[in-house]
């Protein structure tokens, strides 16, 4: 098995937590947020700024390796709002953390 590339810096994780202000999926603000891969590593995702969101313990455990939109539909979460916000956050943080 190939080694997983972990590109997310501590500064990027802090910025993600600040911008999302809680769980990216359900909005929960209590407790410590966990790093969740929108596209799971097992499905070809990367551990990088454009694929990580803060998630509460419950959402992170429930989503596991599921595809995000299907999982959100099953949980009756607002997938459209999540995807729109995900794009906004990616654009905002891409300019802040430009790579050379």
Give the positions of each predicted feature.
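Conserved phosphate-binding loops in nucleotide/dinucleotide-binding enzymes
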Residues: 58
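Histidine-centered nuclease catalytic patch
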Residues: 22-54, 63-75
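Short, charged surface segments at domain edges that flank catalytic/cofactor-binding sites
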Residues: 1-22, 80-97
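A detector for short metal-coordination/catalytic motifs
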Residues: 50, 61-100
């Amino acid at each position: 098995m190939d080694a997983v590339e972990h590109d997310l810096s501590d500064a990027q994780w802090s910025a993600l937590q600040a911008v999302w202000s809680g769980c990216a999926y359900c909005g929960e603000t209590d407790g410590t947020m966990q790093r969740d891969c929108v596209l799971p590593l097992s499905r070809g995702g990367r551990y990088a700024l454009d694929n990580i969101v803060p998630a509460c313990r419950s959402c992170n455990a429930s989503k596991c390796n599921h595809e995000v939109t299907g999982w959100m539909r099953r949980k009756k979460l607002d997938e459209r709002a999540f995807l729109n916000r995900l794009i906004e956050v990616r654009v905002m943080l891409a300019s802040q953390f430009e790579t050379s």
